[in-house]
Amino acid sequence: ISWKREEADNSIQMPPNFFLKKRKILNRLDGKSLLFLSYHVESYAHRIQDSPMSSDILNYHDIWFKFLSNLKKNIKSKIVFRQGPFNDNWEFKSKFINNFGEKYVSNKKRLEHDFHKSKLVINTAMQTTFFETMKTGIPTIILLKKDLWNLSDDLVGLYNKLKSNKVIFTNYDEAVNHVDKIWENPLLWWNSEKLTELRNEFFKICCLENQNN
């Protein structure tokens, strides 16, 4: 059983229950914030995984800071930093506060509350939080470090489409330029015909929408 569509005869794609009936296409954005969702790993690798492990995350932190620091002043002032409910073993939150100030850190208990106030969401992992963001209809991009993520062969095509359409970035300068370009009205880009088709393809492959599950 998998969220992702699999080719094997003995696999079944099932929709994640907590995403059902939540997908939205927004015609306007009430939020004003740039929501930055940080990614976390444990101090020690204790299993095989296709994402950053242990101290790999430190290189990731450098990219995040460079991205945030190079945003235009008017966008930087709208940053809301949110970290997941885990122990901050790598002290990224403390580093963020030292660089930007505590006033930019979210004080909301639920992610949905930050979504409601957001104009654009920056994800840092192709995991559950990204799926949740896609469901909200709020424009989003993913900032990744290229050599720290491994993809199964059947996802390479979708990954490349997301990258060529400026949803996935592995270069922080390119991500900064894109955010600067779309900031005034991110929905012009996000709701374009090309992006809408790509979002539909993403849900079909990675997050099946089916009420009869």
Explain the meaning of each model-derived region.
Residues S2, F36, F81, N123, ...:
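Redox-cofactor binding/interface segments in oxidoreductases and associated redox assembly factors
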Residues R5-E6, N17-F19, K108-R110, K145-N150:
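Short, acidic/turn-prone active-site loops that include or flank metal/cofactor-
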Residues E6, Y39-V41, Q127:
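Short glycine-rich anion-binding loops that position phosphate/pyrophosphate groups of nucleotides
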Residues S11-Q13, L29, I97-F100, L120, ...:
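Catalytic binding pocket for nucleotide-activated donors in carbohydrate/polymer assembly enzymes
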Residues I75-T136, K146-D147:
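Donor nucleotide-activated moiety binding/catalytic core segment of transferases
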